[in-house]
Amino acid sequence: MTNSNRIKLTWISFLSYALTGALVIVTGMVMGNIADYFHLPVSSMSNTFTFLNAGILISIFLNAWLMEIVPLKTQLRFGFILMVLAVAGLMFSHSLALFSAAMFVLGLVSGITMSIGTFLITQLYEGRQRGSRLLFTDSFFSMAGMIFPMVAAFLLARSIEWYWVYACIGLVYLAIFILTFGCEFPALGKHAQHSQAPVVKEKWGIGVLFLAVAALCYILGQLGFISWVPEYAKGLGMSLNDAGALVSDFWMSYMFGMWAFSFILRFFDLQRILTVLAGMAAVLMYLFITGTQAHMPWFILTLGFFSSAIYTSIITLGSQQTKVASPKLVNFILTCGTIGTMLTFVVTGPIVAHSGPQAALLTANGLYAVVFVMCFALGFVSRHRQHSSPAAH
């Protein structure tokens, strides 16, 4: 594979995460405007965004098999057509049913693109370099999550209709579409060139189960925590601005942490540093929940920094449990993480209704403790050392 081809594929991976980050995180910015557009209360409008999450979940789950049937380049190009149709549907329709369908299609497109992006990184890079590259790729999710809400605020402040925000997000997919030209993708399944030697099917091992549970608990814990921090802070008497600043501080340090750890991870055994980071994150979250108001910004900043590498490290370790990175295995762990996203309000909503925001934060803290236990247990069964040692960079 030529170096220019590798660079193009890597940029497709970066932009695939930016696309999903933009679609998921911009929701909160435009929800009120969309509710006004359809003359609905915000509470009932928020339910329609479940179609976006459902699309992401279904596409990541199905793409484990789809990758072996439909070439990756064909998927990305067809995805561009679907993206154009979905954005056009948002622009020219006043029907709530069509809006929900367009959101579902956007979810499908971003889920397929993100799973392809993750798979490309696991194919292009080996050993410890894979972990650092995947972490840098994941930082594009957070970066888009910072940039596109600002774009949305800029457009909405000038009374420009909300659907132009999605047209701007579509430009990210346009860049992916352009990059597919003159670019060779790894072939899979029936499209792959088969060698004379029979392909040995590898068993995943119990380590994959530990990592899948860790992925689900981590995402559910993280989103359950950060979703209720503003309510918890307001309950302590903090202003709305100060409560919002806590969330901004978390994501800002999360992004800086991703950049820092994309360099740091190369020098450590991934399972060991993951266990340390999961333990530190659980302790820092507990200190945030039980600490004084004066110390809360510091605890959430350090929590964001030290927890930033956890999810990507889980995916990387998963890809290293087999000798050859398996798209089905990587997508299985991604699917478990996405299920965590879907369950966020299903799990935390009733807890908050019954016992208040602090109970939701303590539940999230308990989930982080489960992540630590899973990562610690993985140390006894992980195969990553025997699979990554020859290729460590």
From Swiss-Prot:
GO terms for molecular function: transmembrane transporter activity. The keyword Transmembrane applies. Pfam families: MFS_1. The chain crosses the membrane at residues 11-31, 51-71, 78-98, 101-121, 134-154, 162-182, 206-226, 245-265, 273-293, 298-318, 332-352, 361-381. The keyword Protein transport does not apply. PROSITE patterns: MFS. It is found in: Cell inner membrane. Residues 32-50, 99-100, 155-161, 227-244, 294-297, 353-360 are periplasmic. Keywords: Cell inner membrane, Cell membrane, Membrane, Transmembrane, Transmembrane helix. It comes from the Bacteria. It is a multi-pass membrane protein. GO terms for cellular component: plasma membrane. Residues 1-10, 72-77, 122-133, 183-205, 266-272, 319-331, 382-393 are cytoplasmic. HAMAP family: MFS_TsgA (MF_01044). This is Protein TsgA. The lineage of its organism: Bacteria, Pseudomonadati, Pseudomonadota, Gammaproteobacteria, Enterobacterales. The gene is tsgA.
